[in-house]
């Protein structure tokens, strides 16, 4: 049988890894796919780099649009990143009847609805396992492995850079700024780390997972996003003393009022497996009504872990290449005409527990004033610690953990607490999730 002909867009870190894995494991891959998979041509703006990497094993070009129009190409693999040019290339490939494999989370989060509709009309597939959590097969699990379940919630560590920073802050007692500089030196953080440390990258991935889990359109603009740049080593230490660890989580949950979509630092009980995921690793908890909680763990980035997911998609597309489109797994797991328009819950309506840290004057009556404000908002306290003042200091830290309460209530309480003359500066608020069976 004639090999499937692949056009590869981009031969950078992931593109190079994909080319390497596909050639190194060619025999195993073809046995699994049922036919050979051949990278016929590689397009890259740096033609010299492309030629140096592929040698005589594939054609090279710097004209990506010519590649996606070639009649001899069956599958286009998009690994150039960005949203503008990548979107145009993918839509052109689809228009020309090509199946597409992509690792482009930002593109799908922003334009996935348009891309999937175009693919549906042309009867081609868009595969995107590598777009979320690198080598962790979470898309496959959500689309197929958990298809018998009504997904209740997902909570994941889905950005390795942020997880590395938080792990180092906890283990070494370092400040955020110091660990960020170290992460950049080690190559774990970009020169401009904004997407990673402010939760944008995680929000892209959460958008995709929520769409598959609940059969809703991609809605990146409705994800509440808060990063880790304001976290202090003191908060990480206090959380540890209380039996918790702080992780940047992407959380989506089905509720009676709508779907939660949120990315933010979160206290998790130290006893949970996901709380012990360290360094640049990723982990995703998925709760299904039948299966209960399931955990997916692995490398969320890197050349070959991500290439593993890209090549897995190539094998899937190759297997289904000649299948009737009606027999294929839908892009977002649900049949296109059965997608739901469930409302996205506003952040102020989300119910969770909270960690609060206040810097206050060490005077009688201060605690009574604060607890009175919390009681006025029907917020009950689960645990509280008052730290001893340092030598010569007049201020102390008070740390509180609340029971479940609505975000709007905690916001109103914080506003009133910060107006008290005995309270110094802003109240630190970090959300808390138990992540048990419920």
Where are these regions (language model features)?
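A conserved regulatory-domain signal marking ACT and ACT-like small-molecule sensing domains
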Residues: 309, 314, 318-438
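Substrate-binding/catalytic subdomain of NAD(P)-dependent oxidoreductase enzymes
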Residues: 179-276, 281-283, 302
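A short hydrophobic/small-residue beta-strand
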Residues: 99-101, 381
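Rossmann-like NAD(P)H-binding beta-loop-alpha module
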Residues: 120-201, 208
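N-terminal glycine-/serine-/threonine-rich beta1-alpha1-beta2 phosphate-ribose binding loop
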Residues: 1-96
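Low-complexity, glycine/alanine/valine/leucine- and proline-rich hydrophobic stretches
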Residues: 264-289, 303-304, 375-392
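Rossmann-fold NAD(P)-binding glycine/threonine-rich loop
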Residues: 86-96, 105-143
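Glycine-rich phosphate/pyrophosphate-binding beta-alpha loops
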Residues: 294, 298-304
């Amino acid at each position: 049988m004639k090999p499937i002909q692949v056009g590869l867009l981009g031969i950078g870190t992931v593109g190079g890894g994909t080319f390497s894995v596909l050639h190194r494991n060619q025999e195993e891959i073809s046995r699994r796919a049922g036919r050979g998979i051949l990278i016929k041509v590689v397009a890259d703006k740096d033609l010299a780099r492309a030629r140096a990497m592929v040698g005589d094993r594939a054609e090279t070009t710097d004209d990506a649009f010519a590649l996606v129009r070639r009649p001899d190409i069956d599958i286009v693999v998009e690994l150039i990143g960005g949203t503008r040019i990548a979107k145009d290339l993918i839509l052109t490939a689809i228009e020309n009847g090509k199946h597409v494999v992509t690792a482009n989370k930002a593109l799908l989060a922003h334009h996935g609805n348009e891309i999937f509709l175009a693919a549906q009309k042309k009867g081609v597939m868009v595969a995107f396992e590598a777009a979320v959590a690198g080598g962790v097969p979470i898309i496959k699990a959500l689309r197929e492995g958990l298809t018998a379940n009504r997904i209740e919630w997902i909570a994941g560590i889905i950005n390795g850079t942020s997880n590395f920073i938080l792990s180092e802050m906890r283990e070494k007692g370092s400040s955020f700024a110091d660990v960020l500089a170290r992460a950049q030196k080690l190559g774990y953080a970009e020169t401009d780390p904004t997407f990673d440390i402010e939760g944008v990258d995680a929000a892209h991935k959460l958008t995709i997972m929520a769409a598959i889990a609940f059969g809703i359109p991609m809605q990146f603009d409705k994800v509440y996003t808060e990063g880790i740049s304001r976290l202090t080593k003191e908060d990480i230490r206090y959380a540890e003393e209380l039996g918790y660890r702080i992780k940047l989580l992407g959380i989506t949950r089905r509720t009676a009022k709508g779907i939660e979509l949120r990315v933010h630092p979160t206290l998790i009980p130290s006893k949970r497996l996901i709380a012990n995921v360290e360094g640049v690793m990723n982990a995703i908890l998925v709760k299904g009504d039948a299966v209960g909680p399931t955990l997916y763990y692995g490398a969320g980035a890197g050349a070959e872990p991500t290439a593993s997911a890209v090549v897995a998609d190539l094998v899937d597309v190759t297997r289904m290449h000649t299948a009737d489109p009606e027999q294929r797994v839908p892009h977002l797991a649900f049949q296109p005409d059965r997608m739901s328009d469930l409302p996205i819950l506003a952040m102020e309506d989300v119910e969770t527990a909270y960690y609060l840290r206040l810097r206050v004057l060490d005077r009688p009556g201060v605690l009574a004033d604060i607890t009175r404000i919390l009681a006025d908002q029907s917020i009950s306290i689960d645990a509280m610690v008052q730290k001893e003042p340092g030598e010569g200091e007049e201020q102390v830290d008070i740390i509180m953990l609340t029971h479940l309460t609505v975000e709007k209530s905690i916001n109103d309480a914080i506003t009133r607490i910060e107006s008290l003359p005995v309270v110094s500066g802003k109240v630190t608020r970090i959300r808390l999730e138990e992540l048990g069976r419920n």
